[in-house]
């Protein structure tokens, strides 16, 4: 058995161990669509030519940001939509934090390959490059 085969076998047999995980239920596609509709409504309410920002309560930015711009309501897009343990995939919303993703996937013996240092970084933020450390 090769080292890689050995590792694959050990990973397949591994059982998740609780640390501070709080298992959460995925929100589902209907709730996701409600969040998308809420976001679209807030976008359509922004006057033409105005700059926009994400209106959210928390941030992992380590610089100030202007509150003068119109805010897009992303409050309905912060969850895990669905976990498929057979395909080993998860559908998530853009404002989903890595903390919530791990809490939703660990009960299935899954987790992301990479988790940023700040567990409240959103997947959307990490994908756009904000979660990458230099």
PLM region descriptions:
Residues 1-134:
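Noncatalytic alpha-helical scaffold of FAD-dependent oxidoreductases
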């Amino acid at each position: 058995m090769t080292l890689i085969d050995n590792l694959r076998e050990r990973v397949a047999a591994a059982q998740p161990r609780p640390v501070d995980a709080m298992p959460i239920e995925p929100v589902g596609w209907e709730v996701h669509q409600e969040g998308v509709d809420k976001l679209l409504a807030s976008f359509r309410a922004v006057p033409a030519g105005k700059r926009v920002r994400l209106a959210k309560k928390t941030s992992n930015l380590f610089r100030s940001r202007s509150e003068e711009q119109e805010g897009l309501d992303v409050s309905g897009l912060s969850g895990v939509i669905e976990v498929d343990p057979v395909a080993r995939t998860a559908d998530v919303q853009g404002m989903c934090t890595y903390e919530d993703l791990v809490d939703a996937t660990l009960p299935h013996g899954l987790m992301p390959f990479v988790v940023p240092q700040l567990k409240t970084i959103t997947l959307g933020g990490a994908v756009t490059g904000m979660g990458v450390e230099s």
